[in-house]
């Protein structure tokens, strides 16, 4: 693709030496890495703004409204403020590890975007083991958190790091078993392959074509909340118990890196869920043959192909925002649970249910999925059930609001 772009720009690369082509590849990889980190930072900042606006709406207050329209650029002001603060390192801290810990976390976060498909061709690397790669690189985040807690030479930071390590290691098991459900349904570990095995319509998504896949999604979603240290699983940063947990001794730029990753993970976990269970970037009325026809036979694709790529990205972002709202809703609704409750939930409930979903999906694929027209029929029935459940929930919510004499205030949005 890079060589094709250079040829289209009038650059003849046929006579370049092997060293020159290798140097060009290194430059391209460096630019790609910079783009990924910058993109992750922008995603994190916009997620902060979105959560603050949604949480303000939920609590009938204004929220961000000073810097930019509807406070949209407030996250930039916050980032500049953190960058200009004094960077303090405790006198008794392990200075090398204290400095390195935020970069472990940042690298683990940024590497996820390599295999995350934002569109039909909008992916840095379509790895044939994409979901396995994402599971592996996200483990770097907990390494950084544990190193941050240890190197701070503070009991509160150490307790926070140890809690995070125990939490992530425990919830990786149900998350991994839940991920195996869409892998079994699609027959591939590739993120793009998992998306292409689904369809654009809701009754073609993995979450609705198999009753056990919806349960697997719920397990995966809860496990991702725990791995991301989100309420009600924010025990590593519990202010009432550990000051700020592993972040207690961090300030300025290094604190900003942790902050960036924490909010960026909200987007990542929602995007992974959309990819595995909700059809990813699939665009209605635009199947693979439409993308292939728009691509054409030339070195560089035409305008129609780029339009389809934009449409697929918008579909992916819209689905991700829906799940992101659910994450925000959970945070501002549920209280923090205790450590023993967190571990009991994982080992006594999520792990057994995830294993049952895995085995049941195995049997479903062998005995039921091969029957013609099974997927659309099951998908349609589950879609109707989901719509009925959603309207029932909204009706119950409206009844509860009326019963207590409360009102929904739209004036502050």
UniProtKB/Swiss-Prot annotation:
Membrane topology type: Multi-pass membrane protein
TM stretches of this protein: 23-43, 104-124, 129-149, 175-195, 205-225, 258-278, 310-330, 349-369, 374-394
Cellular component aspect of the GO annotation: plasma membrane
InterPro entries cross-referenced by the UniProt entry: NADH_UbQ_OxRdtase_su1/FPO, NADH_UbQ_OxRdtase_su1_CS
Keywords, sorted A to Z: Cell inner membrane, Cell membrane, Membrane, NAD, Quinone, Translocase, Transmembrane, Transmembrane helix, Ubiquinone
Domain of life: Bacteria
A biological process from GO: aerobic respiration
Places the protein is found: Cell inner membrane
Pfam family, one: NADHdh
EC category name: translocase
One Gene Ontology molecular-function label: NADH dehydrogenase activity
Enzyme Commission identifier(s): 7.1.1.-
Catalytic reactions of this protein: a quinone + NADH + 5 H(+)(in) = a quinol + NAD(+) + 4 H(+)(out)
UniProt function note: NDH-1 shuttles electrons from NADH, via FMN and iron-sulfur (Fe-S) centers, to quinones in the respiratory chain. The immediate electron acceptor for the enzyme in this species is believed to be ubiquinone. Couples the redox reaction to proton translocation (for every two electrons transferred, four hydrogen ions are translocated across the cytoplasmic membrane), and thus conserves the redox energy in a proton gradient. This subunit may bind ubiquinone.
Family, as annotated: Belongs to the complex I subunit 1 family.
PANTHER family with a match to the protein in the record: NADH DEHYDROGENASE SUBUNIT 1 (PTHR11432), NADH-UBIQUINONE OXIDOREDUCTASE CHAIN 1 (PTHR11432:SF3)
HAMAP family (alphabetical): NDH1_NuoH
Subunit and partners: NDH-1 is composed of 14 different subunits. Subunits NuoA, H, J, K, L, M, N constitute the membrane sector of the complex.
Name this polypeptide is given: NADH-quinone oxidoreductase subunit H
Name of the encoding gene: nuoH
